A protein has these predicted regions:
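Residues forming the flavin
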Residues: 1-95, 99-254
C-alpha cells in the first residue's frame, strides 16, 4: 500500500479549516494533520465563560485562540470584498450550509450566521474532517518549522513531538509571535501585511433612518410595522495621492 503524503496545517481558524477540507476532499493520497494551540470549540466556550464570569483567563483557549479562530465569538457576519458572486465565495457559503447554517444565507444580501450557530457549524466541520481521516491535535503548539534546502519538511511542537511532512501550511493568524520570530531567525522570507486601524462610531438609529429613507419612510420604521428594516450604510474613500483608503466595516444597525 502506497504511503500517504503528509501535510501539516498549523491553526484551525477559517484558513486552516478550509485548507483541511480542500485537501481531504480532493487529495485522498494525503494525510492531513492539524495542530491547534487552543481547545475544541465546546471547551473553548467553557474557558470563555470562565473569563467573563470569574475573570479566569486561559492563555491558550480564549477569544483569540482555539477552534474556529478569533472570529468564532463574533456575531457571524459573512462579509467579503472580493466578489460576492464568485465561485470560491459561493463554495464557502455552501460549506457553511452543509454544516448547519440556514440555507437562506445563499440568497441573502447581507448574510449573518450568529454566534449561537458557529459552535454547531464548527463542531460538524470537525466531525467531517475526522471522518475523512484528518488528525486534529488540540492543546498543541507548533514551536518551529523544520527547514531543509529552503523547503519546509516538518514541524516540532511544544510537547516535544517531531512531525515530518511534505508540506507545511501556516494558518496561525496574527498572534503566533514566537513562531514568526523563529522563522525570521531561520532566514525564512516574511512579508508584512498592510496595517489597518479602526475606531467605533455611533449614530442615533432615528437619524440614520431619516438620512437614508427620508421623513416619510423613516416613520414607518419607527412605527415598527416591519415593512421597512432599520437603515444602515457603507462608506469608502481612497486618497489617490498615496493610495490609502478608509471604509466602514461591521455595521450593526438597530
Amino acid at each position: 500500500k502506497k504511503k500517504k503524503k503528509t501535510v501539516v496545517i498549523v491553526g484551525l481558524g477559517p484558513a486552516g479549516l478550509f485548507c483541511a477540507l480542500t485537501l481531504a476532499r480532493n487529495y485522498t493520497d494525503t494525510k492531513v494533520i492539524i495542530i491547534e494551540r487552543g481547545e475544541p470549540v465546546e471547551r473553548r466556550g467553557q474557558a470563555i465563560g470562565a473569563l467573563f464570569h470569574r475573570r479566569k483567563l486561559s492563555e491558550t483557549s480564549n477569544l483569540c485562540y482555539g477552534e474556529g479562530g478569533a472570529g468564532t465569538w463574533s456575531d457571524g457576519k459573512l462579509t467579503t470584498r472580493i466578489g460576492r458572486n464568485g465561485e470560491q465565495v459561493k463554495d464557502v457559503f455552501k460549506t457553511f450550509v452543509e454544516f448547519g447554517a440556514p440555507p437562506e444565507i445563499l440568497q441573502m444580501g447581507k448574510p449573518h450566521l450568529g454566534t449561537d450557530r458557529m459552535v454547531k457549524i464548527l463542531r460538524n466541520a470537525r466531525y467531517h474532517l475526522e471522518e475523512m481521516g484528518c488528525e486534529i491535535m488540540f492543546d498543541e503548539t507548533c514551536r518551529a518549522v523544520i527547514v531543509e534546502d529552503n523547503k519546509a519538511v516538518g514541524v516540532t511542537t511544544e510537547s516535544g513531538k517531531t512531525i515530518d511532512a511534505e508540506a507545511v501550511v501556516l494558518a496561525t493568524g496574527h498572534s503566533s509571535r514566537a513562531l514568526f520570530e523563529q522563522l525570521s531567525n531561520d532566514g525564512v522570507l516574511l512579508e508584512f501585511q498592510s496595517f489597518a486601524s479602526g475606531f467605533r462610531i455611533e449614530h442615533p438609529q432615528e437619524l440614520l433612518n431619516e438620512l437614508q429613507y427620508g421623513d416619510r419612510f423613516a416613520k414607518e420604521v419607527e412605527r415598527g410595522k416591519g415593512r421597512i428594516p432599520v437603515a444602515d450604510y457603507r462608506v469608502a474613500h481612497t486618497n489617490k495621492a498615496d493610495n490609502r483608503g478608509v471604509f466602514s466595516f461591521c455595521m450593526c444597525p438597530g
